[in-house]
Amino acid sequence: MGYIVALTGGIGSGKSTVANAFADLGINVIDADIIARQVVEPGAPALHAIADHFGENMIAADGTLQRRALRERIFANPEEKNWLNDLLHPLIQQETQHQIQQATSPYVLWVVPLLVENSLYKKANRVLVVDVSPETQLKRTMQRDDVTREHVEQILAAQATREARLAVADDVIDNNGAPDAIASDVARLHAHYLQLASQFVSQEKP
C-alpha cells in the first residue's frame, strides 16, 4: 500500500481547486464522490439492488439513478439510510482500494468530503484540511449552486464542524483568499509529501 494523503474540507472550501493543483503536479487523485457515482452507474449491480429495494421510480428514463428522489426517501428514514450505506460503503471501499493500488505517483491524494464524519482519517497516513470561514463557505456555495443561504446553512449543520476537521489535520491550507494563492501552498506541501512518502517506502522494505 502506498502513502495516502487524505484531503477534506467543508462544502465550498475549495477541495476541487486544491486537488486539481496536486493533479497538475502529477499526483494521482482518488475522489470519493466520483467513486460513489461510479458504483451506481447504469448497469451496475448496486443500481439494480436500489431499484429492487426502493422501486423502479428511483431510476430515470435514461437508466441513471434519481439522486434527489433517493435523498428525499432516506432523509427522514434512518433504517433506509442504513440499508443504502450497507450496500454502497463496501463497494466504494473496494473500488477505492483498487484505485490506490493502481496509482503510480509517489503518494496518492484521497479526496473525502466526509472524512471526519465517517472516521476515515484513520485510513490515511496524513490529513490535509482546506480551511475557510463559515461565511466564505456560505457565499461560495450560494454563488456556485445558486441556492439560498438557508439551504447552505442546513448542509453546514449536517457536516462536521470546522473545529472537528482541524482537530484531525496534520496540514492546513487557508483558502479564504484568492484561488491563485493556493499554488504556493500546494507546491510546499507536495515537496514535503514526497519526502514523507520516500521515508514511508524505505521503512516498508524488509
Swiss-Prot record:
Keyword Ribosomal protein belongs to the record: no
GO biological process, one term: coenzyme A biosynthetic process
UniProt pathway annotation: Cofactor biosynthesis; coenzyme A biosynthesis; CoA from (R)-pantothenate: step 5/5
Nucleotide-binding recorded as keyword: yes
Keyword set, alphabetical order: ATP-binding, Coenzyme A biosynthesis, Cytoplasm, Kinase, Nucleotide-binding, Transferase
GO cellular component: cytoplasm
Listed GO MF terms: ATP binding; dephospho-CoA kinase activity
EC class: transferase
Positions contributing to ATP binding: G12, S13, G14, K15, S16, T17
EC number from the UniProt entry: 2.7.1.24
Catalytic activity: 3'-dephospho-CoA + ATP = ADP + CoA + H(+)
Annotated CDD domains: DPCK (cd02022)
One Pfam family per UniProt: CoaE
Localization in the cell: Cytoplasm
NCBIfam families attached to this UniProt entry: dephospho-CoA kinase
Summary of the function given for this chain in its UniProt record: Catalyzes the phosphorylation of the 3'-hydroxyl group of dephosphocoenzyme A to form coenzyme A.
Protein name listed in UniProt: Dephospho-CoA kinase
Organism: Shigella flexneri
Gene from which the chain derives: coaE
